[in-house]
Amino acid sequence: MPVAKDLFPEYGTLATGENEPSRNIRRAQKLREFQNLELPPYLAKQVAAKMAEKGLAVEATGGVAVQRIAGGSQSGQKALMGASSSALTKHTPSASQPTTHDSLTNLGANLTQSKPAWHAPWEIYRVITGHQGWVRSVCVEPENQWFATGSADKTIKIWDLATGKLRLTLTGHIMGVRALGVSPRHPYMFSGGEDKMVKCWDLETNKVVRHYHGHLSAVYSLDIHPTLDVLVSAGRDAVARVWDIRTRDPVVVLSGHKSTINRVKFQASEPQVITASADETVRLWNLQAGKTMTTLTHHKKSVRGLTLHPEEFTFSTASANSSKQWKCPEGDLVLNYDDQNAIINTLSVNQDNVMFSGGDNGSIGFYDWKTGHMFQSTQSIPIPGSIESENGIFDSSFDKTGLRLITCEADKSIKMWREKPNATAESDPGLEWKPKIYQTY
């Protein structure tokens, strides 16, 4: 009489029972399914200890633990369980190692991990003051000569990147300035503010030459396409608007979010628009069709941080205590970053795969982009004369070389960071890395 196969053995056995051949078949199926996964050394020791408690033989062969399972052949039941510095790294199957231990059945959805590269720690080398309100936005011009900051004091200030000295103050907004961007193709700078306005500044005359009307509430973010003459802006009205820079006409209106859009970016190669919203979602939009391609619902709180890698087709998003990396253009989840105990307001990444994360409580994290490991954690310190609560970080940007970082903060200051000179892996090893099992959820 045939015996039904138990599809959920972890929840109990079928009442009809199961004979020994059926159990061996099911075990062999699991072994084949996970034959190319390898355990990190510390997990291999734990598994070996558990198997010893169950009375199953575990022997060491050339530094690799091999388990013999009763009821099956030795060649079909050897399991690689150690001898690797990376966690769950995939390797090419061979006849000598066709299968792994069936304790790996719970690890099927885990991501490949590798040891992170060493990065030098970062330190503050300059503090700039001059704004009379919270500094809410920053952008670096394409030639890497100066950068601009926008503030709640309604002004835009332009600073020399090398010396940190004030070059110019621009006035024109009647409320706080929340977004800035400099065109890589034209001598224009764009600004968005709480006055619902998007302004185009001629950098040769330092005057406003265009206004873009349409937003029904404050503009929180904007971005300029690197190759097309279009601009995207978004904000509290939950809509992203794409504009023709020259004619000021709206090209397309991207609607679908249910709450404030905190960040918006162009992904030039598709072309795509990526938006991060307070409705806890991230949307990827087809720019030509003006429709949503993908909605990412993995975050459980308002998504405030968004950054694109300058050399890869990947991007990262952040909300309270959660940062995630995604792949363009589909929006596939790549990895979860180490936790940061803060509501994260801003993310930035440079060419050297260093990602900066700044929180509303002054929490700062530096991450390895490839692995999600936080190699440095520190805290912003308010400048003298500020109250303790004024240590939030609102915006950040690396310069074009990736060697300097600029942060905008609630203490009305601008802080500039660089890698610690003469740092080595021996003198500054950073936070300890341990392999973890990240779930794709």
From Swiss-Prot:
Location(s) in or outside the cell: Cytoplasm; Nucleus
Compositionally biased residues, Polar residues: 83-107
Entry superkingdom: Eukaryota
Biological process per Gene Ontology, one example term: mRNA splicing, via spliceosome
Signal peptide boundaries: none
Keywords annotated in UniProt: Cytoplasm, mRNA processing, mRNA splicing, Nucleus, Repeat, Spliceosome, WD repeat
Pfam family, one: WD40
Ranges for the WD repeats: 130-169, 172-211, 214-253, 256-295, 298-336, 339-379, 388-427
Cellular component terms (Gene Ontology): catalytic step 2 spliceosome; cytoplasm; post-mRNA release spliceosomal complex; Prp19 complex
Region of interest called Disordered, as start-end residue ranges on this chain: 1-22, 81-107
CDD domains according to UniProt: WD40
Keyword Nucleus in record: yes
Functional description taken from the UniProt entry: Involved in pre-mRNA splicing and required for cell cycle progression at G2/M.
Record note on quaternary structure: Associated with the spliceosome.
Family statement drawn from the similarity comment of this UniProt entry: Belongs to the WD repeat PRL1/PRL2 family.
PANTHER family: PLEIOTROPIC REGULATOR 1 (PTHR19923:SF0), WD40 REPEAT PROTEINPRL1/PRL2-RELATED (PTHR19923)
The name this protein goes by in its record: Pre-mRNA-splicing factor PRP46
Organism: Yarrowia lipolytica (strain CLIB 122 / E 150)
